[in-house]
Regions:
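Collagenous Gly-X-Y triple-helix signature in extracellular proteins
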Residues: 1-193
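Short, low-complexity, charged amphipathic interaction modules
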Residues: 192-234
Length: 237
């Protein structure tokens, strides 16, 4: 097990039965992303939705809120999930939808641009971002693009499309950086490198060997090591 604070951006780790990738280390917390998306769902399929691309009223938010509440398996895991603020600005950075504080949410378009070199390509599905293509503009009657939301292709490219379509769910979390997490390729720092936990065959047993025999073997090995630096006649080579 390792402290989350010690993991570099781009490192994948296990938490609450899921795999996450570290995006960045912050003051006392780590911003992380689900390593692969979960099942698909519409961003918003509500018939009475006025602005379908407003995350605060979306089907996607309801699904993610339920997912994050069910995610932790222990009280320690639950306490490690910290609330964070999400910027719901649209593509031109207008702020009609404001911000929202949650425990899990998709990345914004700008976070995707910031971290895309660290994000593993999504293997099975396209997935939603949280950023709307456009917000309702009070001085314009045009509302068509208030149905559009940004999403990411499996190859890492990104585009926007109608919120009624179903794409993958790939939330980000903010976790307490003191959290102990496991790694699939983990080798404990204080391990010998030969025992079972390192994948080796274990150390030989010393049961039944006398102290005198052990001391004799130590002396023999010390003399043999010394011959590397001395000639056959005992002088320096």
């Amino acid at each position: 097990m390792k402290k989350l604070a010690k993991l570099s951006p781009g490192r994948i780790f296990n938490f609450a039965g899921e795999k996450f990738v570290v995006m960045e280390q912050r003051d006392g917390a780590a911003f992380v992303l689900l390593a692969q998306s979960k099942e698909s769902c519409p961003f918003n399929d509500k018939d009475d939705a006025e602005n379908r691309n407003d995350y605060t009223r979306s089907t996607l938010k309801e699904r993610i809120d339920k997912w994050v509440e069910a995610l932790p398996r222990t009280s320690e895991e639950a306490a490690a999930i910290l609330p964070f603020e999400v910027d719901l600005s649209c593509t031109d950075r207008s702020k009609s939808y404001g911000t929202i504080t949650v425990k899990a949410a998709p990345l914004t378009l700008w976070q995707y641009g910031q971290f895309k070199e660290l994000i593993p390509l999504n293997e099975d599905d396209w997935y939603w971002l949280v950023t709307p293509w456009a917000c309702r503009w009070l001085r314009s009657p045009c509302t068509y693009y208030t149905d559009y939301v940004w999403y990411v292709y499996s190859n890492g490219d990104f585009y926007s499309y109608n919120a009624s379509y179903s794409y993958g769910i790939r939330p980000a979390l903010l976790l307490n950086s003191d959290l102990l997490v496991s790694l699939d390729d983990e080798v404990e720092d204080d391990c010998c490198g030969e025992c079972d936990c390192c994948g080796g065959k274990g150390l030989p047993s010393l049961d039944g060997i006398s102290t005198a025999t052990l001391l004799e073997e130590i002396q023999r090995r010390a003399m043999r090591a010394g011959s590397v630096f001395m000639g056959e006649d005992g002088t320096d080579e």
